[in-house]
Amino acid sequence: MKRFLKKTVLNELINTRFPICKTRPNTSNNPTTSFVLGIVNYRGQKFLDGKTKGPSKWNTIHPKLFQLLQELIRSFKPDFQYTTIQVNKNTQCKPHIDTNNVGDSYIIALGNFTGGDLVIESKKFNIRNRFKRFDGHLAHWVEPFEGDRYSLVFFTHTFKPPIRSLANLKITEKAIYDKDNKLIKEY
């Protein structure tokens, strides 16, 4: 099941149109092809009438991918609590720390590539087709690679006030519901 699910996720990633992201200077000196699913901070988006966090617009642009990624992490670690999923294509991150994360993160890389190990404080980890738990507050980066590499990072953001885990929420464009479909918050 997990192998089939990984292939399904990879096929969906291959068929996903990735935007150019210029707002991640802590991870790369160059624009990246990436986006965020789940709940996000709204930085510099004036049209949101003062709202500071809520559902990512990418949840509704890529609903099938969003659902598949939630199934993927659930198939590996059913009890893992997270709010946000960073989705990267061919992104070679420079050494950085994730200052806006709380607790451990899980990362996996999918695709047809060589190289691209995750390095955490000088220790290398092969994350191709396998999840790795790590502390984003430790310096980490990606080794050079060749080919198409998709990395998925599942983490909890330091929202104030805290938000419940995405693992137990249903998110639409305008609201967040709990697992019993009870309204938690409208946007």
Locate predicted features:
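Fe(II)/2-oxoglutarate oxygenase catalytic core
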Residues: 1-131, 137-187
